[in-house]
Amino acid sequence: MGSSVYITVELAIAVLAILGNVLVCWAVWINSNLQNVTNFFVVSLAAADIAVGVLAIPFAITISTGFCAACHGCLFFACFVLVLTQSSIFSLLAIAIDRYIAIRIPLRYNGLVTGVRAKGIIAICWVLSFAIGLTPMLGWNNCSQKDGNSTKTCGEGRVTCLFEDVVPMNYMVYYNFFAFVLLPLLLMLAIYLRIFLAARRQLKQMESQPLPGERTRSTLQKEVHAAKSLAIIVGLFALCWLPLHIINCFTFFCSTCRHAPPWLMYLAIILSHSNSVVNPFIYAYRIREFRQTFRKIIRTHVLRRQEPFQAGGSSAWALAAHSTEGEQVSLRLNGHPLGVWANGSATHSGRRPNGYTLGLGGGGSAQGSPRDVELPTQERQEGQEHPGLRGHLVQARVGASSWSSEFAPS
């Protein structure tokens, strides 16, 4: 693989990583059903993947050219991608622990896992990621080693900027890989294994003698589906990053082995960066709420088609009904937290916390409504078939939104 092919593929990955993960953050921003503790960690993971596309990949392309630079400047370029990798690892670990608590001790979940605590954990994860990734900047580097070839080519105090020339391989293997990549991955493997074993045991108990007050079988199955989706993301992370680390291990432990050819190194680097692209596809394929919100964003903001917003499988459609005096009528979808308008924007902060309201004036535009109205679900369905009906008001009974319900199988 030539350098021009490598650069072209890297740029394509960068664009896809930015677009896909911006879509994830956008979906969480506009859909209140996605605004929960677990998705705080998902957004943190998406932010790291956006930074890979914006910064890490351009840095990697720059380093691949072997340009002349001050050693510590080159070192910062080389280490920055390690910061983002570490942030992704910590986000995945936090998600695994969050799902473990949700399944093992569901009655205590809301008390233990709060938004404030989640944001604090995310902040700590990012601080630790910078500390671990930038450790070579503090002295664990090759800058003190004199390279006659670099001095001859680049001049005194400057080096040929290549990753292995500035970052020591013992740091990459012992510290970065063994301590902060492999160990967290094994921990996540153990957590998800315990999640599935606990869920299996609970499902068997429900079949034999269901106890009053326990979660229903369908709720637990949704939790398991959620855990499977996130376990897939962890598995893909390992699949994308382990080849590069395995090559580093061979380089470090087998001094007599032939160094990996450039095409293999390029392929391993591309595979590691491609991990930043795959997560949005997993969300879209496995998580119904994300999939519906992605469609809404693309159709409304990319294709410029105005259509009703869907959340949790229920349509938030505008009911064109008003009285003969022209007074406004609104449709409230019960069971939801603060929601979104039909055009995808957030509701007013003064809305009731148990639902969102679509106000329709005489002109049919969404606006504030003086009163909420409720109708049977059957009439709502009939109203969709006969949009010209006047005076029919609809109540769409939507169950309380929970994070696990987003993961209900399609």
Swiss-Prot record:
Note what the entry says on domains. The cytoplasmic C-terminal domain is necessary for targeting the non-ubiquitinated form of this protein to the cell surface.
The cysteines covalently paired via disulfide bonds are 68-154, 71-143, 74-161, 254-257
Q: Subunit structure, per the record?
A: Interacts (via cytoplasmic C-terminal domain) with USP4; the interaction is direct. May interact with DRD4. Interacts with NECAB2. Interacts (via cytoplasmic C-terminal domain) with GAS2L2; interaction enhances receptor-mediated adenylyl cyclase activity.
Protein keywords? Cell membrane, Disulfide bond, G-protein coupled receptor, Glycoprotein, Membrane, Receptor, Transducer, Transmembrane, Transmembrane helix, Ubl conjugation
Annotated membrane-spanning segments are 5-29, 40-63, 75-97, 118-140, 169-193, 230-253, 262-285
One GO term in the molecular function aspect is: protein-containing complex binding
The scientific name of the source species is Rattus norvegicus (Rat)
Localization annotation: Cell membrane
Q: State the superkingdom.
A: Eukaryota
Q: How is it modified after translation?
A: Ubiquitinated. Deubiquitinated by USP4; leading to stabilization and expression at the cell surface.
Protein function: Receptor for adenosine. The activity of this receptor is mediated by G proteins which activate adenylyl cyclase.
- Annotated adenosine binding sites: 164, 248, 272-273
Q: Name one GO cellular component term.
A: presynaptic membrane
Q: Outline the segment boundaries, as ranges, of region: Interaction with GAS2L2.
A: 322-410
Designated name of the protein: Adenosine receptor A2a
The opening ranks of the lineage are: Eukaryota, Metazoa, Chordata, Craniata, Vertebrata
Provide Cytoplasmic-side residue ranges: 30-39, 98-117, 194-229, 286-410
Q: Which residues are glycosylated?
A: 142, 149
Keyword Acetylation in the entry? The reply is no
InterPro entries reported in the protein's UniProt record:
Adeno_A2A_rcpt, Adenosn_rcpt, GPCR_Rhodpsn, GPCR_Rhodpsn_7TM
Expressed, tissue-wise, as follows: Expressed in striatal neurons (at protein level).
Q: Which Gene3D superfamilies match?
A: Rhodopsin 7-helix transmembrane proteins
Q: Where is the composition biased (Polar residues)?
A: 401-410
Biased composition (Basic and acidic residues) is annotated at: 371-388
